[in-house]
Each structure stands twice: as structure tokens, then as C-alpha cells.
Amino acid sequence: MRKYRIIISGGGTGGHIFPAISIANTFKKRFPDAEILFVGAEDRMEMDKVPAAGYKIVGLPVSGFDRAHLMNNVKVMVRLAKSLRLARKTIREFKPDIAVGVGGYASGPTLWMAASQGVPALIQEQNSYAGVTNKLLAKKASKICVAYEGMEKFFPADKIVITGNPVRQDLEEALSKKEEALAFFGLSPEKKTILVVGGSLGARTINRSIQGDLDKFFASDVQVIWQTGRYYYSDASKHLKAYRGMPVWCSDFITRMDYAYSAADLVISRAGASSISELCLLGKPVVLVPSPNVAEDHQTKNALALVHKDAAVMIADKDAEKDLVPTALKIVHDDERLCTLSRNIETLAQRHSADRIVDEIVKIIDKK
């Protein structure tokens, strides 16, 4: 059997990293002798998460463009030039059969240099609205794996394959663990539970909304699992000292998302593509608060794709501190509404996405 060599590039947030690791794990399960190398951004969370998953990673000194302060981009361009050189060196030394881009800062220079050296490239576009980098890379890609219909307005139709977004493999059996999950968080099976997640780094508006309205949760006999993200945990934990003994579990990062989803009757979340894919797979009712701080406002577009099918409720970031908690509490006590949202979001699930993407990778390599 042929020994495949693959580069997977991208990261920056859990929404890019966990699908990338899922693709790698699926490939290794099918082809145990495969050599897989990750290429990420040197100061981002992939530099920790990827080695923890058992894979080697090279860090590029790449960073995003500052659209608000154009003069700051001189340093960005210098870092980009260094990243292109390191990406070229990495590709020459590793000699991959294919380069797979999953989004994030490192994906652009890696796939660009791979294509310039005759290495086939595959893009995994997670969002319903393609970013500038992937639109540029599309010309050089052999295939583009997407999660939403209608992506031919961004990419050549003959290159598009609808695969869905891979999810963390520990979520596969999440719904069968509710009693075990509630015990893990020290919560009661007699109360409704709301899971609050703002992404691996955190979401300021969501955290402020929860912090400001904690009394409303407890007055409504609702318990909370709250992931603050790395940047907001210190402030939240200080605030919670006034609520000792109340049914709230709080941490900067949830290591057992299978338990968190299983315990939750309702989820409050940003509208990143990876989170939405997980929610669809598990049929979890959700109130989405799209981040306004993303390229092309793509999270709002992701959320609206669900809202238009009555598969989620959306609160604009600017309205969250006023409306988020009252809306969530109204929904969590309405079993009929919970059932409708759950049923509708589950119909949008794309299952076995990592396997489909691996199929496309193998087809491209075997054509060489």
C-alpha cells in the first residue's frame, strides 16, 4: 500500500483546528502508515492543540491584516514574506502528495507555495460565505470541500464537493451520556441546563450578557455550564464569588464537550461554522450570537442559513446584553419550541464529513 504524505494547514481558533485534527485522525485510521505534517501560525493555539493530538507542526510567523490601521500592515507584509519562504522550505523538505487548507492565517501561504511547486491543493471552506484568501486560492485548488449549498457564487462549480464540516470525534455518542454528563459538572437532572460557549478564545458580549444576568438564570431555576474562553475567565471567576452554591459550572475551556452538549437543553453560542456543524449533528436547540469581528460578517450569514429554516434563533451582538438571557430563558422553558428547533437543526446535519474529505484527498493523490 502506498505511503501517503500530507500537509494540513490552518488554525487560529478551535473552529479550524478541531476539524483539521478530525481529518488527520480519519486519514490515519484508514492509512496508518501515512505521514501527516501540520503547518500553523507560530503564536496561535494550534501550536499546543496539534502536538497534544499526536501530530508534528511547523509554525509560520504569519498574522492577519489590520483593516482598521493600514500602516500596521508593513509588519504584516514582512511576516508574510518570511512565512512564504518557510512554507516553501517546509514543502521542499517534506515532499507532500497534497496540501489541505482548513482556513486560518497559515493556510494561505502554505497552499500558495504548494501549488507553485506543483503540489495539488484541497481547500476545506467551512462557512456559507467564502473569505478572500480561499477565493484567491480556489484558482489553484484541485477540489474545494464545502458545507453549504450555493457556493458556486464564490468558487468554480466543477471544483466544489459538498462534504459538510468535520466535527470532534468524541461527539459521536454525546447524546447517550446525559446523566453521566450532569454528574461530571455537578449539576441536577431536575433542572433545565443552558450551555454557554463563545469559542475557544471567548466572546466579550456573550460573557458580559451572562455575567450581568446571572440572577435571572437562578430565579428561573435554570443551571448554567459556562465556557468563558481564555481571555475572560479571570473576570468571570471573580464575579462568581458572589454566587457560591449556585448551580453554575464555569471554566475557560471545556475539555469534555461531549458531556457539555449532552447535559444541555439549550445552547448559547457564536455562529462559527464548526460550532454550527456540531449543533446540527447533535440536534441541539441554539441561540446564536454572531461575532461582528469576522471577515465579511460571515457568522451572520452562517446563522441566517439556520434561522431561515427555523433551525436556530439569532440575537445580534449589539442587542445581546439586553435580549440574550431573556430570550434563552423563554425558549428553555418552552418544550414545544425546543423540540421544533432540535428537529429542524438536525435535518441540516452533514454526517461522515471527515470521511468524505479523505475520499476527495485520496482521489486527488491517486490521479497524480
Curated annotation (Swiss-Prot):
GO biological process entries: carbohydrate metabolic process; cell division; cell wall organization; lipid glycosylation; peptidoglycan biosynthetic process; regulation of cell shape
Sequence positions that bind UDP-N-acetyl-alpha-D-glucosamine: 13-15, 127, 168, 200, 254, 299
Reactions this protein catalyses: di-trans,octa-cis-undecaprenyl diphospho-N-acetyl-alpha-D-muramoyl-L-alanyl-D-glutamyl-meso-2,6-diaminopimeloyl-D-alanyl-D-alanine + UDP-N-acetyl-alpha-D-glucosamine = di-trans,octa-cis-undecaprenyl diphospho-[N-acetyl-alpha-D-glucosaminyl-(1->4)]-N-acetyl-alpha-D-muramoyl-L-alanyl-D-glutamyl-meso-2,6-diaminopimeloyl-D-alanyl-D-alanine + UDP + H(+)
Keyword terms, alphabetized: Cell cycle, Cell division, Cell inner membrane, Cell membrane, Cell shape, Cell wall biogenesis/degradation, Glycosyltransferase, Membrane, Peptidoglycan synthesis, Transferase
Subcellular location per the Swiss-Prot or TrEMBL entry: Cell inner membrane
Record pathway: Cell wall biogenesis; peptidoglycan biosynthesis
The keyword Cell cycle belongs to this UniProt entry's keyword annotation: yes
Cellular component annotations (GO), alphabetically ordered: plasma membrane
Membrane topology category: Peripheral membrane protein
Pfam families: Glyco_tran_28_C (PF04101), Glyco_transf_28 (PF03033)
Gene3D superfamilies, per the entry: Glycogen Phosphorylase B
GO-annotated molecular function: UDP-N-acetyl-D-glucosamine:N-acetylmuramoyl-L-alanyl-D-glutamyl-meso-2,6-diaminopimelyl-D-alanyl-D-alanine-diphosphoundecaprenol 4-beta-N-acetylglucosaminlytransferase activity; undecaprenyldiphospho-muramoylpentapeptide beta-N-acetylglucosaminyltransferase activity
Enzyme Commission code: 2.4.1.227
Family: Belongs to the glycosyltransferase 28 family. MurG subfamily.
Function in brief: Cell wall formation. Catalyzes the transfer of a GlcNAc subunit on undecaprenyl-pyrophosphoryl-MurNAc-pentapeptide (lipid intermediate I) to form undecaprenyl-pyrophosphoryl-MurNAc-(pentapeptide)GlcNAc (lipid intermediate II).
NCBIfam families for this protein: murG (TIGR01133)
Protein's recorded name: UDP-N-acetylglucosamine--N-acetylmuramyl-(pentapeptide) pyrophosphoryl-undecaprenol N-acetylglucosamine transferase
